[in-house]
């Protein structure tokens, strides 16, 4: 295999891993933050918010891992059907699945800690701040690794997360009921 082709394959493998890790972490952060903000907006107490967040973490991790496994398996099967040998294909379904599962769970822990911490009166604000900081870091990291604009990546991440949390919180507030 020529050196440039080997370099291309190494870069492809690195970018696939990075994509899965960033997508998994961002999805964990944003999905679970949206869930817990919606439940908090409905007026739920700390244990209820924590339970909803844990359920979202578990379901999301399994979903991301399973989805990544299916996606990478299909990619691998397609490449092999077009004549590439199994050794030439950089698609590793189980590795990708595990990476997405762990990345989602790692990202999801942050909003859970922020919303259920000892700062009850500021739980929503703490969550928003923690999520903005975390997504700024993942946005910068993705831009650095991909040699693209950190500002664009960070702004994109932060806007999506603020919209997700704001809409979820508003829906929770509008539809929430107080349980006596």
Which residues does each PLM region occupy?
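Cytoplasmic-side transmembrane-helix entry/capping segments in multi-pass membrane proteins
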Residues: 151-160
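Short helix-terminus and kink motifs of transmembrane alpha helices
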Residues: 64-68, 72, 148, 152, ...
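Juxtamembrane boundary at the C-terminal end of a transmembrane helix
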Residues: 169-180
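Membrane-embedded alpha-helical segments of multi-pass transporters/permeases
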Residues: 69, 136-140, 169
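Transmembrane alpha-helical segments of integral membrane proteins
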Residues: 132-148
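Hydrophobic, small-residue-rich transmembrane alpha-helices and their short perimembrane loops
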Residues: 1-110, 114, 118-131, 141-142, ...
């Amino acid at each position: 295999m020529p050196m440039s082709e080997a370099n291309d394959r190494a870069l492809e493998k690195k970018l696939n891993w990075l994509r899965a890790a960033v997508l998994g972490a961002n999805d964990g952060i944003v999905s679970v933050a949206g869930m817990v903000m919606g439940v908090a907006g409905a007026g739920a107490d700390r244990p209820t918010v924590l339970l909803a967040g844990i359920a979202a973490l578990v379901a999301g991790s399994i979903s991301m891992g399973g989805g990544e496994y299916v996606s990478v398996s299909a990619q691998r099967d397609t490449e092999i059907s077009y004549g590439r040998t199994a050794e030439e294909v950089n698609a590793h379904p189980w590795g990708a699945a595990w990476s997405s599962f762990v990345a989602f769970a790692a990202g999801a822990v942050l909003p859970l800690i922020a919303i259920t911490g000892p700062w009850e009166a500021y739980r929503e604000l703490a969550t928003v701040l923690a999520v903005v900081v975390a997504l700024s870091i993942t946005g910068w990291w993705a831009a650095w690794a991909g040699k693209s604009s950190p500002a664009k990546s960070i702004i994109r991440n932060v806007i999506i997360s603020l919209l997700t949390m704001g809409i979820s919180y508003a829906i929770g507030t509008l539809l929430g009921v107080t349980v006596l």
